């Protein structure tokens, strides 16, 4: 298996388990080395430049362990599980919308250099765009309210991808889908899952326009919680999700 396929498989694996208790660095057994000390000095460790770009999920908000969320765990796993010598840069900023991420990609010289050097990139985007629409139209929300904003978001996502490819034409990009924590903050929005599904469909359809750009869905893992129970119900008086950060009921916690 070549490096590209290994990287692709590993990214999908860890991001799919992003919000479950089966963190790979705890459950994947590590085979004991059969190399002698002399042999190990002869093995050149392959290098990998991992770039994480996005919003609070990339920054690691909600991870009370202080490790930095899924991106840091993924970077560590490249080393621990596959022996890569990893260069890891994290450009996640909490609250960033797609417009703000694109602006940073144009204006941040450090990010521009990181894009040129990266071997693989993850992107978390879209959740704050959706939240902005909810807050702006809160008194008059309908599923159709999100149609135009979703399309506009999709166009901005394409601009982000094109910007990354301008700097690095063959860069594999993994775009993480959004999930539905809104039933905890806005339990009256019972159609919110339909909106989140549509938002993810928009993201996935845009990624399919590019070779080497992949959509990674995470909604089912987060929306249903640790026990796999549906998050939205008629009785919204007591709703909880043990994969979300208790302080805001929005971001994944360290288990998530």
For the regions a language model picked out, list residue spans one by one:
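Oxyanion-hole/transition-state-stabilizing segment in secreted/luminal serine hydrolases
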Residues: 103-148
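Histidine-centered active-site loop/cap adjacent to the catalytic His
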Residues: 240-256
């Amino acid at each position: 298996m070549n490096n590209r396929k290994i990287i692709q498989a590993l990214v999908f694996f860890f991001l799919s388990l992003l919000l479950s208790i089966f963190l790979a660095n705890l459950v994947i057994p590590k085979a004991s080395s059969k190399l002698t000390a002399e042999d190990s000095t002869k093995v050149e460790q392959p290098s990998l430049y991992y770039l994480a770009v996005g919003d609070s999920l990339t920054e690691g908000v909600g991870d009370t362990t202080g490790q930095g969320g899924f991106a840091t765990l993924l970077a560590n796993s490249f080393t621990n599980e596959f022996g890569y010598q990893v260069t890891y840069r994290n450009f996640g900023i909490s609250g960033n919308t797609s417009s703000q991420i694109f602006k940073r990609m144009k204006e941040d010289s450090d990010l521009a250099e990181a894009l040129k050097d990266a071997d693989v990139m993850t992107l978390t985007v879209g959740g704050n765009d959706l939240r902005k629409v909810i807050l702006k139209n809160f008194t008059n929300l309908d599923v159709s309210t999100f149609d135009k904003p979703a399309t506009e978001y999709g166009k901005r996502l394409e601009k982000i991808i094109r910007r990354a490819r301008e700097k690095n034409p063959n860069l594999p990009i993994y775009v993480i889908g959004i999930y539905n924590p809104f039933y905890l903050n806005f339990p009256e929005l019972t159609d919110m899952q339909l909106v989140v599904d549509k938002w993810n469909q928009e993201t996935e359809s845009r990624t399919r326009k590019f070779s080497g750009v992949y959509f990674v869905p995470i909604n089912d893992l987060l929306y249903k919680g640790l026990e796999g129970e549906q998050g939205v119900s008629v009785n919204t008086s007591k709703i909880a999700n043990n994969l979300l950060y208790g302080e805001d009921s929005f971001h994944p916690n360290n288990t998530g």
